C-alpha cells in the first residue's frame, strides 16, 4: 500500500494510522466508485468499532485520504 503525503497529514489529524488502513483494506470492506472523482474508489469498513472510509486511486493501491464514513456510507456498510 502506498500512502501519499496528504493522507499521512489527514491520518494524523483524524487519529487514523497506516496500520488501521491496512486492517480496513485487507479485512472485510466494501468498495464503491467515488461520485466526485470517477478515477477513485472508496473502501468502507469497520476498524476498532468505528466505520471509516479510505479514498484510493484507481490502482486500488494508493491511499489518498481516510475519514470517518459519511452517514450514507455507514448505512451502506450496515445493509451489506
Regions found by a protein language model. Give the residues of each.
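Ribonuclease/tRNase effector modules and their secretory precursors
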Residues: 1-80
Amino acid at each position: 500500500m502506498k500512502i501519499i503525503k496528504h493522507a499521512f497529514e489527514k491520518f494524523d489529524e483524524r487519529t487514523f494510522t497506516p496500520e488501521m488502513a491496512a486492517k480496513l483494506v485487507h479485512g472485510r470492506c466494501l468498495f464503491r466508485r467515488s461520485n466526485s472523482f470517477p478515477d477513485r474508489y472508496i473502501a468502507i469498513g469497520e476498524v476498532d468499532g468505528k466505520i471509516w472510509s479510505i479514498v484510493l486511486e484507481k490502482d486500488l493501491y494508493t491511499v489518498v485520504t481516510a475519514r470517518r464514513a459519511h452517514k450514507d456510507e455507514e448505512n451502506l456498510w450496515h445493509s451489506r
